Amino acid sequence: MQGTVESQGTAIAVDHAHEHPDFRVLGLLVFLISESLMFGGLFAAYLLLRGMHEQWPPEGTEVELFVPTINTLILISSSFVIHYGDVAIKKDDVRGMRKWYWITAAMGAVFLGGQVYEYLTLGYGLRTNVFANCFYVMTGFHGLHVFIGILLILGVIWRSRRPGHYNAQKHTGVAMAEIYWHFVDVIWIILFTLLYILTRF
């Protein structure tokens, strides 16, 4: 009789949990939608300014492709790497998740390092002309998001040190970091196309 009551209590608790889903992922998605609108505004303004100028970018503010292309490959690859971490935690492999998330954070740091190197070697600054202004604002805003993404990943790694904090059934924080990182990746692909590819052809 007692076992039956306990089983019923467990079932009720499970049903109750299903009635109250974790809204953190939904909150993240709403945040990313708002960020997408901000980036969309920047993209629209950039394209409008480009259409108003016969020569784009203006002479003396050309961009190089070598470092940004390497950076792009690193960031795209990191999206696959972080996904391996999500796969690992779904198999209750916390150590594997940590490994892949460490690698992702390192790749993000290398990306930022490449971005800083590019800034130092471009030969023009934020106020040189309208293209330079767009370039620094857009890539800098994206770089800020990459930095935030690295912090989120490191936060997941830190919290995973607590036994049982993440497992195959409870890994919302891991999933949120992955979703955010994929968002950062997609935004960069658009930026790379606008600022580097389309300005060379």
Curated annotation (Swiss-Prot):
Membrane topology: Multi-pass membrane protein
Family: Belongs to the cytochrome c oxidase subunit 3 family.
Membrane-spanning ranges: 25-45, 65-85, 100-120, 137-157
Cited SUPFAM superfamilies: Cytochrome c oxidase subunit III-like
Keywords: Cell membrane, Membrane, Translocase, Transmembrane, Transmembrane helix
Highest rank taxon of the organism: Bacteria
Protein's recorded name: Cytochrome c oxidase subunit 3
GO cellular component: plasma membrane
Subcellular location: Cell membrane
EC number: 7.1.1.9
Top-level EC class: translocase
Annotated PROSITE patterns: COX3
Family matches, as Gene3D superfamilies: Cytochrome c oxidase, subunit III, four-helix bundle (1.20.120.80)
Species this protein is from: Thermostichus vulcanus
InterPro entries (UniProt xref): Cyt_c/ubiquinol_Oxase_su3, Cyt_c_oxidase-like_su3, Cyt_c_oxidase_su3-like_sf, Cyt_c_oxidase_su3_a-hlx
Record GO biological process: aerobic electron transport chain
GO molecular function: cytochrome-c oxidase activity
Reaction it catalyzes: 4 Fe(II)-[cytochrome c] + O2 + 8 H(+)(in) = 4 Fe(III)-[cytochrome c] + 2 H2O + 4 H(+)(out)
